[in-house]
Amino acid sequence: MADPGFSNLDPHTAQVEEAEKDLSEGVMGLVAPNKKPGEVIAKLASSRMFILQEASVYALAAGMEKNPGTFAVGVVNDEDKPVGIVLRRELFDNLGRMYGRDLYKRKLVPELMKTPQLIRDDTSIFSVADNLAEELRKGTSIYYVLVDGSGHYSGIFSTTDLLIYLSNITARDISLARRLQRAIVKECFSFAGERTSIVGSSAMAKEVGGDFYVVKRLTGGKLLIAVCDVSGKGIAASLITAVLGGFFDGYTASNSVKSFVRKLNRYIIDTFSLEYFVTGIIIELDEGTGEATVCDLGHSYMLVVEQGKLKRLGSDASNPPLGVSPKLEPATGICRLNPGSSVVLFTDGVVDQTDSSGHDYTEQRLWRLLKASGGLPPQQLSTKLTTDLASFRGDAPQRDDITFVVMQYC
């Protein structure tokens, strides 16, 4: 659709003929694309069009009508330095008003231009985003004129251009974070040891989350099993799960649970400066004897079913979450699993899931399910728990990440 105020003019009027003459004489043009390396603001220039300050308003309107995708034009002097900016919307609003065509028929561009806000075109995009944080929150397009190191005009960008760029960056980051997290935290996992059968499951509430679990075979007939929950959501939480994955991957039988926890706690504090914490349960299991060294880090979601009876498995000692206390001296407990027992480790996303009426799934419901199904093989028990959660939730959205590990000791 043509812009009002100019396209409705008689194309044979003297003003339009004069405008065409101005255009043919080069009063309006495009600067060359800026090819500066790196993530600089020049990359976001959505308009490279300029017009000389001595040009007529009609010449500007003619040029913009020929370039319908241009929303702003820089006004430059004879040294190619910007002296103003004209927005397409404001230009044609003025020309479209009553008597607007007559009012501006002899006017020059400076009558309509605004003083430009200048930004160096080699400035980092992220630095510009930081400086314009308040403007970005306003939700309206604000235009800025770019200049090179000599002050010459090199284009125009808007806060909308910047928001689109940042949105694309965020989308790519989330996609990368999701791939990274899924490489570390599998949606489904199964493991068969000498005397254990284990199934793991993790379903994120969003694209990325903060739940983590690991099952690792160690030398000497031992297993490492852990379930952790990172505070917060999103990319930051997924970054911490990557840290956890790296640490647990380096765990060996020569480690002690206590020394491992101390090192991991120190790293989380040094890296994330007490901004995030991690609850979790870490178990080192001797498959031959059934002896389990348990370190409960402010988590406590660990249940064991033996001969139809359900109890909470854990240490009497209390530990804070990882990343809270720089001087953490972890306490561990020892328990022994009997053949035929089942152990379930889970995150709070299981019991905190709500139905469409806002009622929680609750730990009591989980207890009932486990007491009735504790003798099932891990895969069947995992399927039953997943099905029951889905049935309970109904149309309600998944509230939090849901992660659990089911182990049967034979």
Model-derived regions, located:
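Bateman (tandem CBS) regulatory domains
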Residues: 34-49, 104-117, 248
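The conserved cystathionine-beta-synthase
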Residues: 50-70, 76-77, 95, 119-141, ...
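Short, low-complexity N-terminal regulatory "tails/caps" that precede and couple sensory modules
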Residues: 1-48, 148-164
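Signal-transducing coiled-coil linker helices
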Residues: 49-56, 121, 172, 190-193, ...
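Short beta->alpha transition motifs characteristic of CBS
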Residues: 74, 81-99, 152-168, 298-300
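Active-site-proximal, acidic helix/loop segment immediately C-terminal to a metal-coordinating Asp/Glu
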Residues: 235-254, 313, 337, 341-396
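… and, occasionally, acidic/histidine-rich disordered N-termini of signaling adaptors
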Residues: 169-338, 342, 396-410
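Juxtadomain coupling helices with adjacent low-complexity linkers
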Residues: 2-5, 10-12, 126, 136, ...
